[in-house]
């Protein structure tokens, strides 16, 4: 079931209270806007009085040219005032609405940036986009028209009631008796209308998510010749949206029909009761004309409010969906007494660390104790789902530990500011994301203000300088959306260059060579070794390639959230049975030596290179002979 159907709806009064602080910022503009609205309203109210004066004068046979000119001049002046007030009301009101929309979108985006990975794991980007674009546009219209409409309606209804009572109290009471009944029906239909609009907004978010998925994955779509699958997914989403929108229009039709019926009822009452009053001399012809005009004004005002209900409910829906974003708790945040992280060496300690995801009670990490020395090059290996990536995601606090603690140079990561922590930890994801822009902009992304020389130096250290200079526009080459104009290896090296430009003391790399060919893998691993060797950066490398793990100073084997082995490559790789039990590919040289030991040899299993293996075999053969 969709969120539109399961979440309880907040009251309109609650939503308006959430919205008022944004409007209060522009209360001066709002006051002038309402002043202009009052002027236009008074001008509208004056017209029936002019017509009554003119009609009564005619009936008294006292009409003169002077009277006509005076009334015409008054009407002309009122229309000039009305036109000027309408101009400012329309322009200033909409501009105020745009300012409010901008402020709300800024706050929503700022809040989205502070939300953690869990929120994005469970929320479609298409839904988020709908909330900060279409929904807030409806809020703009609401912010402008809502105060105006209710202010104008209040003046017109009150003025009409007073003036109509002056003409005929009994007739006025009969006419206004229809209003409460109309209000009850309108409130009931309004609730249904709001629910339809919410469902409509949710469904357009789902459709946006489907479109985004298909367009961003168009290379995969074409690779699998899956255009028909995507067409069907889109068609289904489109049909669902069509169905919801059809139901919305049915609700609107019922709403508008009820309005017209009540309009007709009020006119019927006026014609019947007013005509009888005129016949029996209870009201003059001029008063009846004015009465009909004021009733028309009253009915037009009520109809305008009722028609505004659609826009009102759209605005309420937009505010509600905005509030849902703002009410999403920020679970990863600075502690009240957080201090900047001070990194001198770059040592990392995991002290009895356990972790489980918020929406899953299965422990992903179980009492992990691990000390990574400053400047050490560590490889994490193990099967998929063993906890390697999760362990590394805890270092920059993409998630918080559920047990134990993580220390960097003796400082608990939960006690330091996120900005300083993530500025000291460089992270290169397996699925590299480059922003739409130039190579230079992507390298400098984590360090705004970096000079061109610093950008080029970072690229050189990452092994990217040569290929970047060979591009058509060098460092000013546009990389395309998500870096589609670069190869996998090029994107990886640009990403590493971006991390280097940050000047971190620790780098975490999650399968950085998973999608590269052997040549690309060699270049990336050589870059990592150079960073570790020349700059003393602590390196944590997650990899499935044992040939890469061999080159690390230390290898840690993980499975089911636990550390199974920890040591140098020559200490870990001889544990053939352990490695194979967790699905790891043991180096061929080690497997050869291990097999020989199974048939009676007693060979050391730490000969990792081909040359070392050959030397061990020659020595063993010599000893046998």
Regions found by a protein language model. Give the residues of each.
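An intracellular "coupling" helix at the cytosolic face of ABC transporter transmembrane type-1 domains
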Residues: 28, 117-118, 134-143, 147, ...
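Transmembrane helices of ABC transporter permease
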Residues: 25, 29-42, 75, 148-199, ...
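Membrane-integrated ABC transporters
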Residues: 1-44, 59-71, 89-93, 97, ...
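Helix-loop-helix
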Residues: 60-73, 163-177, 247-320, 325-326
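ABC-type nucleotide-binding domain
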Residues: 341-506
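Alpha-helical transmembrane segments of multi-pass membrane proteins
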Residues: 78-97, 148-155, 176-200, 255, ...
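Transmembrane helix-loop-helix hairpins at lipid-water interfaces of multipass membrane proteins
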Residues: 30-88, 165-170, 268, 281-285
